[in-house]
């Protein structure tokens, strides 16, 4: 019935045709007892398709926390200090221990240095830092925006040969006049 004329006979006659067909089929499947529950749970009754199995994830809040250290979990400071290898909690809590470093002033200069704790760092003096040298011949500090290039000591001095000569003759380029170069800081003589 690919021809449009064949379809028109159904519309013009206003006839309705009902077709009934019966198909008998037999399917034999063998499954184990463990497979039937997973296959049946994955079948969707609406579509009859097999869906992915639901993935059950365990929640961390339901699980008992695992302690990797042999410390008392009620004393958080001791647990952190054992994990990081810091000083014992007794050095911070009690005042009878002597350390080489003290935040309070003492009248006896040898009171804090008689014992040195094994956890203290050995500080060594450093050489003073020198400022980095500039690897370039020109820097932004040497450039005068009106003239183009200037001397570091006198920013209003024009270097001959950059835009031409100082008087503006020769060189092919246009150079600002010497009046503009010397008055570069005033707002009335700026180039617009």
Swiss-Prot record:
Keywords: Nucleus
UniProt keyword annotation of Nucleotide-binding present: no
Compositionally biased spans, kind Low complexity: 24-38, 102-114, 175-192
Residue window of motif VQ: 76-85
Transmembrane residue ranges: none
First-listed, main subcellular location of the protein, grouped into a coarse class: nucleus
Compartment(s) of residence: Nucleus
GO annotations of cellular component type: nucleus
Region (Disordered): 24-65, 101-135, 163-192
Segments of skewed composition (Basic residues): 52-62
Additional information: Plants over-expressing VQ22 show stunted growth phenotype.
Described purpose of this protein according to its UniProt entry: May function as positive regulator of plant growth.
Protein name: VQ motif-containing protein 22
Organism encoding this protein: Arabidopsis thaliana (Mouse-ear cress)
């Amino acid at each position: 019935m690919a021809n449009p004329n064949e379809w028109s006979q159904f519309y013009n006659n206003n006839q309705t045709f009902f077709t009934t067909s019966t198909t008998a089929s037999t399917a034999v499947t063998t499954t184990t007892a463990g497979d039937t529950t997973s296959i049946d749970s994955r079948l969707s009754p609406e579509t009859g398709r097999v869906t992915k199995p639901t993935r059950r994830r365990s929640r961390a809040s339901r699980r008992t926390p695992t302690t990797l250290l042999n410390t008392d979990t009620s004393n958080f400071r001791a647990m952190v200090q054992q994990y990081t290898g810091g000083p014992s909690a007794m050095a911070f809590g009690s005042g009878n221990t002597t350390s080489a470093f003290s935040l309070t002033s003492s009248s006896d200069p040898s009171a804090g240095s008689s014992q040195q704790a094994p956890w203290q760092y050995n500080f060594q003096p450093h050489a003073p830092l020198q400022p980095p040298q500039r690897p370039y011949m020109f820097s932004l500090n040497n450039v005068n925006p009106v003239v183009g290039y200037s001397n570091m000591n006198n920013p209003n001095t024009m270097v001959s040969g950059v835009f031409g000569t100082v008087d503006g003759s020769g060189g092919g380029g246009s150079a600002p006049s010497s009046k503009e170069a010397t008055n570069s800081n005033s707002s009335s003589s700026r180039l617009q």
